[in-house]
């Protein structure tokens, strides 16, 4: 960098040479990301620099000014040369990227183009629907409307002019050419709908059988009674986190209070935070518990690649991991009870084929708003029915990524954590299953966590959960076909686990209720039966709500919201199926930091008071302590009532207008059930499109 005096002179001369024109600073960035040249050309900075230059001229004399002018001209030439070199380098880099694009860049660009393509398709569909509605309204007011079952072509004497003739020609065209492909597609979607409904019914019957026979994994005797001689195995506890300042404290606190001999377990806080202030806060929390005698270490990666999988993979590469037999994983918002290890670890005893013990999630904010209530319905069914049934009858299910205990040997023999997808939990579960390891699910062991309270956070979470599996399917398919497991297990993995529950469900849900149904309103010759629109979906929603009976009043909002979410899930499924850019994205779900107990804030405040200043000074540096104080002051000065803004979702709004348009058309045909379904579904899309469901984003 140039000396301060030289920089002042350059700015002053540069401003004079340009006639005092105001502008914005010009930043020339070279190929090295750590080197940049900033040329000041802004109104405020220029005035300050001119004042400084005048002051220097008054104190330096004429001779010194001449020598300084020569140096200034030299620096001006150097700056211009560097700027030209930077532009040349940028041009060369852009040209190189154009001819040497990485697959990820190409996929990302394709993903953005696909998103625009889908939105364009919805807009085009909406425009055609509005045009068709205008035609139908004109026909209705002129008395040309023909009822669906009795469609016929009028005789020549009945035609009342060229407009009526054109309308009759349109009716004949749609009956002869448009009706057949719509009927074929609708029948295919109805078939998929029936298959998926049967799968859900079988799962519910399996859950009923488990409840009736009281089937569940059990521990023989009480291994922790006095005099039992139980040898506590070595357990590693991992807490991966990334910029989650709202929840880090309570998750670390809960892990440190696990009821297990302290010499027999170690806690790894795997911090991938990019915010240095959050890193300091987490370090201080780790230091506090370490001072209290807990075996806890703080790990931070310099190269944060691979998202959560890369974080876990890096932690498992430590030399001391070989001394541990099991690893328990908790995300940053999870709060295990003190007896968690005592309820899970004994299941491994005498069961060498057992690779995973998965606990159930419980939600501290399930009653916070309508969005969290609807999520609770979905996840209660997932754990109570899907995970429990698959665990009892198949000894296999998708690992939920947290609140589970792995046998480290199972992880290592299955290839460990891989960074190839954003669903590393499902990836390792499939590979472990192919290697012959068994899983059990403990429905009565619950770990507290949070649900996303804003639609934006929930939408991003669902996108990752539905794009990752389809991407993983292509990666695992060769291994599934060549694995040394039974044919029915291969069929279960391919047909049920991946295709039916990860691909078919979002496909038919979006296509049937958001495309075909409104389309049949304008092509009444291809009508959908009422049982597909109303009766079967209501029955399936009733089955979904059975595991959470208190949510029964929300059965209708749940049905409508699930159809609304089909847009996001279909979008994610397509991106994962074709390996587009958005299937590689990992966005940490926003947390609110809600506690599980009403007095948790009091307990945290009490612990904070115990963390005295001298104790902190022994464990973190003085500069870090100053940063912590400044961070606390900024939090205290922050406004309490931050203004929140609603985000507009264009796809949902466009689909809302489309469905409301189709509802208007169904009203002309006196289709009662079709009209009410389209009306309520359109209003549901409208609420979501205007971000009126859940907590608004800051």
From Swiss-Prot:
Topology in membrane: Multi-pass membrane protein
Residues that coordinate or bind substrate: 331, 333
Cellular compartments annotated: Golgi apparatus membrane
SUPFAM superfamilies for this protein: Nucleotide-diphospho-sugar transferases (SSF53448)
Family the UniProt entry places it in: Belongs to the glycosyltransferase 2 family. Plant cellulose synthase-like C subfamily.
Pfam families: Glyco_trans_2_3 (PF13632)
Transmembrane intervals: 124-144, 190-210, 503-523, 528-548, 653-668, 673-693
Superkingdom, natural source: Eukaryota
Main location: Golgi
Alphabetical list of InterPro entries matching this protein: Glyco_trans_2-like, Nucleotide-diphossugar_trans
Active site per the UniProt annotation: 272, 425
GO cellular component term, pick one: Golgi membrane
Alphabetical GO biological process terms: cell wall organization
Key words of the record: Cell wall biogenesis/degradation, Glycosyltransferase, Golgi apparatus, Membrane, Transferase, Transmembrane, Transmembrane helix
MF annotations from Gene Ontology: glycosyltransferase activity
Gene from which this protein is expressed: CSLC2
Enzyme Commission number(s) from the entry: 2.4.1.-
Full protein name: Probable xyloglucan glycosyltransferase 2
Enzyme class, UniProt record, top EC level: transferase
